[in-house]
């Protein structure tokens, strides 16, 4: 059993004893702590909290415990049922709610679940708020409602349609152009909530044909749910046979978008954001944001339009903060996460699909031809295992000093930008390891510079 408590929420494997896995007692504790924080900090008078969940097998149990606890804390619950993460985020603002809880473990395997916590803007709690939830939970500073102040329970299953309408209403989504292109599309939704909402979206966008793979929302994932090439053999094989223009693949909560070209080759999840940003910047030039571990291609595309690129620390809440601070027109993360503030400040695969198809319709290229128009970069990912007594911060400080003549960013670990490549070192908050990301114009060069910096770290750790 595993239970991980962090500033972004609580996640774990279902079962086990209290404090050792994600079970009803721990769910009650952290839901109560979240409700206590919202009661103290919200400026909203609605008294509502929205709850949505992905299709995980444990979702029904977790939902019942969460909803009952929120009612016991005196909040009215708006349960929107099976819903994507971006749908739940939008529902918070559409309802005028005080906050929201998303029940999803994202791309983690079926035995996992999690509580992801939203503020009244439908955005994830910041680090300070997340830390306060952990403190309240540890101290058990809960004050449950008396009989006259228990919350009410409402079910509202209309938010998929409301989300789709919001996407269709975006100025840069051109339904007529998509319809005229007569696209044939395949989708893999890993038997979660994407299987409910994506076919509806594609139909409303005017896509001519949709081939559905693993679209039953049973929570019985047919492959590892992270949308990486090694997990997508079935849909890549389908695409390689021909007959489809593009395939879209989402994770269980539909905030990450991967794509497959018409020839069965991966588009590259780093390039989901790059491509959508290219389209947005062409029509509405402005600043862009991604995290430090994302491809340099977004910077290159942004500069092509004479605009400014900014990097944030890793994590959606940090990307959103930088988007707001720089008034960016688009941002996101290199894992296929597209954040389009014109819609809302959260990763949203539906927005990504609609903008990508609009771009593809206007360009008149095949998907592989479109991919070839972007700068070719390759990212290598490694890790350095250290002993628990190792002072990781001291090592990172020494690395920063060694490479002070290069462009160095230390807002999240240490990132060293060389003229034609970069390396990013990030320490784990839970283990004595350093994650190493490196990018260059070839995979060999990315591996080489990554290994070089790893050797430096090993020498400093002796």
Predicted regions, residues:
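Proline/glycine-rich low-complexity loops and linkers
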Residues: 71, 134-165, 169, 261-334, ...
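Glycine-rich phosphate-binding loop of actin/hexokinase-like ATP-binding domains
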Residues: 101, 114-115, 119-133, 255-282, ...
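Short glycine-centered, acidic/aromatic-flanked micro-motifs in structured strand/loop junctions
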Residues: 51-54, 187-189, 261, 342, ...
